[in-house]
Amino acid sequence: MDDKKTWSTVTLRTFNQLVTSSLIGYSKKMDSMNHKMEGNAGHDHSDMHMGDGDDTCSMNMLFSWSYKNTCVVFEWWHIKTLPGLILSCLAIFGLAYLYEYLKYCVHKRQLSQRVLLPNRSLTKINQADKVSNSILYGLQVGFSFMLMLVFMTYNGWLMLAVVCGAIWGNYSWCTSYSPEIDDSSLACH
């Protein structure tokens, strides 16, 4: 019974230390893992390599202009250097621009598919067009969610790249939207 109580105490202390260090940010890495158990043989884990923290993705919960160790949506898209930041911003700018182009293509396609039925204001769309419209809609929603996730890095440079790409894309592909076309979507952007 003593072993269970001691193990529980050590586990709770370790959990408390992890929560405290991650929430308050006092420690970026653990210098040692030397946990002495009272009344039992100690376990010394100080020889374990925990990494130096240089290659870990940071997750900002507040707005930041820092770019080092920022991961963009995927673990493999890891910004470590200034050139990496610049290339990432250009890629994100391009993605936001392409999103606006996709919106333009969807709108243009919807306008071209409109065939008025006699004496009605309804439109008739064939099955193949419904399938392709649904696929394009899915791409549009997926694209917008990816851009939302980029924005949720809270990195000022990446957020600026999304906004600038959207501005330039809207300027390049802006159309006068027809009120008859339903523009409601799940798009986050």
UniProtKB/Swiss-Prot annotation:
Zinc among keywords: no
Its record classes its membrane topology as: Multi-pass membrane protein
Protein family membership: Belongs to the copper transporter (Ctr) (TC 1.A.56) family. SLC31A subfamily.
**Classification of source organism:** Eukaryota, Fungi, Dikarya, Ascomycota, Saccharomycotina
State where it is primarily located: membrane
Q: Which Pfam families match?
A: Ctr
Q: Which organism is it from?
A: Saccharomyces cerevisiae (strain ATCC 204508 / S288c)
Name listed for the protein in its UniProt record = Copper transport protein CTR2
Where can this protein be found?
A: Vacuole membrane
